[in-house]
């Protein structure tokens, strides 16, 4: 038997492509792209000039936005300047008040000095004015003392309420702690009982498993021994049969030889 011929004729792929001819075109080709209509240089210049100038709509939009921004800037400037003017006015008012108070104090001092050097009538007038001033000072002092007492009483009351609230909060916290501790102890006791029960169950199950394994091993051992005994008995029977058969053959051969 000869080998089968599996040879295949070799084809040059380039030669095969030339023989097929040009492939059918689908869509545009490179020649179509190269022969596309192109604008002239003058048209390109016009387009560039239009881009440089920009569109009218964009210019109008920019003008509107600039006008809005100008208005907003003017409003913000007015607000800032108005706020600065108000602050300056307030400062001027404070300065004027201080000046008036200083003038009043100077007048009082001058009136006191003039009362000591003037006549009895003027002294009586000055004494009345000084007594009125002293009364005013006493009233002011009394008012201040009353305010201080009220503040101190309110502070004491607030301190007492705070201390009472603190004691109440401490007592409530202690009670909550005791409750939580008792609950934790109960949970721990329950968990311990459960663990003990689980352990006892696991130990009993392990013992039962051990007993089962021992019984199964004993059964296997007894079954293996029985099989061994049966195998031995079978072998003995076979040996006996073989011996009987060999004796019969020997007898036949001896009888044939005698004949």
Swiss-Prot record:
Coiled-coil annotated spans: none
Basic residues composition-biased segments: 100-112, 142-154, 233-253
Basic and acidic residues composition-biased segments: 39-49, 59-99, 180-191, 211-232
Region (Disordered): 18-259
Amino acid composition bias (Low complexity), ranges on this chain: 113-132
PANTHER family: FAMILY WITH SEQUENCE SIMILARITY 133 MEMBER B-RELATED, PROTEIN FAM133
Family classification: Belongs to the FAM133 family.
Protein name: Protein FAM133
